Amino acid sequence: MNVPAALRYTKDHEWIQLLDDGATALVGITDFAQSELGDIVFVELKPAGTALKEHEIFGTVEAVKTVADLFAPVAGEILEVNAGLDSAETVNQDPYGSGWMVKMKLADPASVANLLDAAAYRELIGG
């Protein structure tokens, strides 16, 4: 199972990557999550401009047999949604790259440090 060391993770299986400016980040679902969901057929995300509280639902992922909510790892505002997810299978193929979900402006960039690091996330998923 792929768990990149440079990212932070939630117990709900989202990842977050701080961008170079230190105030914005990309958010997506983990390799473990996409594997557990199976073939993803549709992704619905709240639009750019939406303010989110930590743990607030920012969208859903629909797979062949289930629908899963997406939870904001930290508080902030959605700046951009990934238009490439019109092809939802991108999440299965590249969850940490072209399968990212939203770009966020973080309310408190330091809050990312409170999330799980790669070792703690691996332990959570039993890997």
UniProtKB/Swiss-Prot annotation:
A GO biological-process term: glycine decarboxylation via glycine cleavage system
Free-text remark on how the cofactor is bound: Binds 1 lipoyl cofactor covalently.
InterPro entries listed in its UniProt record: 2-oxoA_DH_lipoyl-BS, Biotin_lipoyl, GCV_H, GCV_H/Fam206, GCV_H_sub, Single_hybrid_motif
Residues found modified as N6-lipoyllysine: 65
Residues in Lipoyl-binding domain copies: 24-105
GO (cellular component) term, any one: cytoplasm
SUPFAM superfamilies from the UniProt entry: Single hybrid motif (SSF51230)
Function field: The glycine cleavage system catalyzes the degradation of glycine. The H protein shuttles the methylamine group of glycine from the P protein to the T protein.
Any Pfam family matching the protein: GCV_H
Entries under Gene3D superfamilies matching the protein: 2.40.50.100
Keywords: Lipoyl
Domain of life: Bacteria
First and last residue of the signal peptide: none
Record keyword ATP-binding present: no
Assembly, per entry: The glycine cleavage system is composed of four proteins: P, T, L and H.
Gene that specifies this protein: gcvH
Cofactor(s) recorded in Swiss-Prot or TrEMBL: (R)-lipoate
Protein name as catalogued: Glycine cleavage system H protein
Cytoplasm found in the keyword field: no
Protein family per UniProt: Belongs to the GcvH family.
